[in-house]
């Protein structure tokens, strides 16, 4: 979950019911007092969550979100539909959007040949096309994307532009090919800093 009110951000996995209720209470006390009139939310993983926590999250938090960002398996849980094709992604996105009354960005990274994501917002479908980057170090891609979207929303960009900028940032972090430790390591979140240093 990523909560952004103005320049503040809070990230973390909501693994239990008690944490989810605390998050909702915190969210209810934080309101933007400018033209936005509501908090910016980008919601991610159902992984590692207990079943009752998933149910509570769906009931209490999804209706408060500006956008939820499930991957394919998570979108299947939220929609109750199997996703095997692009058409399935569209049906699932529409179902989640109508059921929880929030925008939904279904991430297509679990498909083999591309990294195309589908946004359903205000009853409209928008595809964000991307190129799959052959990098084994993909730990935290979903968290990075949702955090980046929330950050750009907090800077005043609209949802579509926030997603475009977030996907560009994520692609850059993957393309940098940082290789730390063993297994599926992290991406290079500071790749833009390295570019600036090299220019200087």
Tell me what each language-model feature is:
Residues 27, 33, 38-60:
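Glycine/small-residue-rich loop that forms an oxyanion/phosphate-binding "nest" at active or ligand-binding sites
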């Amino acid at each position: 979950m990523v909560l952004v009110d103005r320049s503040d951000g809070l990230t973390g996995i909501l693994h239990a019911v008690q944490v989810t209720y605390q998050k909702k209470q915190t969210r209810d006390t934080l309101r933007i007092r400018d033209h936005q009139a509501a908090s910016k939310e980008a919601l991610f993983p159902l992984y590692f969550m207990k079943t009752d926590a998933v149910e509570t999250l769906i009931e209490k938090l999804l209706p408060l979100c500006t956008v939820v960002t499930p991957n394919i398996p998570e979108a299947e849980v939220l929609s109750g539909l199997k996703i095997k094709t692009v058409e399935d992604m569209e049906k699932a996105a529409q179902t989640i959007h109508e059921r929880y009354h929030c925008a939904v960005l279904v991430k297509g990274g679990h498909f083999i040949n591309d990294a195309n994501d589908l946004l359903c917002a205000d009853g409209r479908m928008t595809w964000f096309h991307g190129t799959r980057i052959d990098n084994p170090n993909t730990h935290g891609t979903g968290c990075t994307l949702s955090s980046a979207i929330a950050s750009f929303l907090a800077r005043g960009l609209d949802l579509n532009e926030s997603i475009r900028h977030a996907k560009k940032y994520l692609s850059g972090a993957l393309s940098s090919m940082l290789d730390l430790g063993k297994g599926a390591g992290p991406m290079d979140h500071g790749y833009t800093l390295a570019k600036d240093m090299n220019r200087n």
